[in-house]
Curated annotation (Swiss-Prot):
Gene source species: Verminephrobacter eiseniae (strain EF01-2)
Catalytic activity annotation: (2R)-2-phosphoglycerate = phosphoenolpyruvate + H2O
Domain of life: Bacteria
Coiled coil: none
GO molecular function, one term: phosphopyruvate hydratase activity
Protein name: Enolase
Compartments reported by the entry: Cytoplasm; Secreted; Cell surface
Listed GO CC annotations: cell surface; extracellular region; phosphopyruvate hydratase complex
Cofactor: binding comment: Binds a second Mg(2+) ion via substrate during catalysis.
Name of the gene: eno
Length: 428
């Protein structure tokens, strides 16, 4: 038995300088597991609740001392003595202790920090790397990275409404080469932006935030960078978009400030997305519609679900109940997985498994506020998810995940697999 003998929660800072929760879990053997939770900038209204102090005298109200106190008192008392290798039982204990549907009493950030730290301690105790502990011997697939190279929306201070413009190295032979391809395109893009006299400062997730005339201009910059780096757009490196459409949905219309204040109905906005898919090598669109625009989602899915990957983030918030509703209604064909949207590892794995059974893809994702914690890299391999979103090719909080995936690929050796285009099951 890997008994938990001590838990220590603390307030640390994330990549945006905002407080977050870190947790250490000590086992009877002396082994310790540590984890820190991420935080989002654009959040779905149905996400599990991240507990903040609300005290304007500390961190502009964003402190997490209440969540830390919950870790060090009530949660600690409930889990001390439990077997760290019984992850599902431990997570159920946390869920029952909180007693709310959205984890608002204890805070999803407090609960997730403990859930992750326990898994890390148990993996260390077993002598296994975390990905192997989580997934077993069948965990051999590295994820295709979706690299956010141009930022807009809530992640940048420019006129772009769409939140992320991503490159996806679908033609790479392995993860190491995929990472190299992405880095080379990133640097080519930086030179192009610099030569145009625009700022090469990066946003929260490490991508550039140039002030361009419209969204297609941003896409064309990326295509130019792919060519300049010596790669073929579409065949070797495809494109992905995170629209984060809930952020620019106003009074039933999609209001695009980056298109001169254009106000579009759902069908008109879908027409624009479909035109981009026909014109450019776009293979993935995330949150193409407002999270509550069910009719819009149905129309988008009917129009494009057999052509591109349609990812639900705010739509599903890593929640199996919401995902099942989407599956039943044939809305989207993919789910974004963010561990802090739901608050425990067990619930995270349940969402991934449900997606797979329904023929949906699962994309493991970071948040805009990250730490050096690399758990999502191990989850991506441990679950054979096939895809990961963890930012651009800059900022150590993003690179940490890529470097961990390099180590995992090296550890797997000849059995390591890189799915490339096959990870995107819905391409025409």
């Amino acid at each position: 038995m890997s008994a938990i003998v001590d838990i220590v929660g603390r307030e640390v800072l994330d990549s945006r300088g905002n407080p977050t929760v870190e947790c250490d879990v000590l086992l009877e053997s002396g082994v310790m597991g540590r984890a820190a939770v991420p935080s989002g900038a654009s959040t779905g209204s149905r996400e599990a609740i991240e507990m903040r102090d609300g005290d304007p005298r500390r961190y502009q109200g964003k402190g997490v001392l209440k969540a830390v106190e919950h870790v060090n008192t009530e949660i600690s008392e409930a889990v001390l003595g439990l077997d760290a290798s019984e992850q599902a039982f431990l997570d159920k204990t946390l869920i029952d202790l909180d007693g709310t549907e959205n984890k608002s009493r204890l805070g999803a950030n407090a609960m997730l920090a403990v859930s992750m730290a326990v898994a890390r301690a148990a993996a260390e105790e077993s002598g296994l790397p975390l990905y192997r502990y989580l997934g077993g011997m069948g965990s051999v697939q590295l994820p295709v990275p979706m690299m956010n190279v141009i930022n807009g929306g809530a992640h940048a201070n420019n006129s772009l409404d769409l939140q992320e413009f991503m490159i996806i190295p679908v033609g790479a032979p392995n993860f190491r080469e995929a990472l190299r391809w992405g880095a080379e395109v990133f640097h080519a893009l930086k030179k192009i932006i610099h030569d145009l006299g625009m700022s090469t400062a990066v946003g929260d997730e490490g991508g550039f935030a140039p002030s361009v005339e419209n969204h297609e201009a941003a896409i064309r910059l990326i295509l130019q960078a792919i060519t300049a780096a010596g790669y073929s757009a579409g065949e070797q490196i495809a494109l992905g978009l995170d629209c984060a459409a809930s952020e620019f949905y106003q009074d039933g219309l999609y209001v695009l400030h980056g298109e001169g204040g254009l106000k579009l109905s759902a069908p008109q906005w879908i027409d624009m997305l479909a035109a981009w898919v026909d014109k450019y090598p776009i293979i993935s669109i995330e949150d193409g519609m407002h999270e509550g625009d069910q009719d819009g989602w149905k129309q988008l899915s009917e129009r494009l679900r057999d052509k591109v990957q349609l990812v639900g983030d705010d739509l599903f918030v890593t929640n199996t109940r919401l995902l099942q509703q989407g599956i039943d209604q044939r809305i989207a064909n993919s789910i974004l997985i963010k561990i802090n949207q739901i608050g425990t590892l067990t619930e995270t794995f349940a969402a991934i498994e449900m997606a797979k059974r329904a023929g949906y893809t699962a994309v493991i994702s970071h948040r805009s506020g990250e730490t050096e914690d690399c758990t999502i890299a191990d989850i991506a391999v441990g679950t054979n998810a096939g895809q990961i979103k963890t930012g651009s090719l800059s900022r150590s909080d993003r690179i940490a995940k890529y470097n961990q995936l390099l180590r995992i690929e090296e550890d797997l050796g000849e059995v390591a697999q890189y799915p490339g285009r096959a990870a995107f099951r819905h391409l025409r």
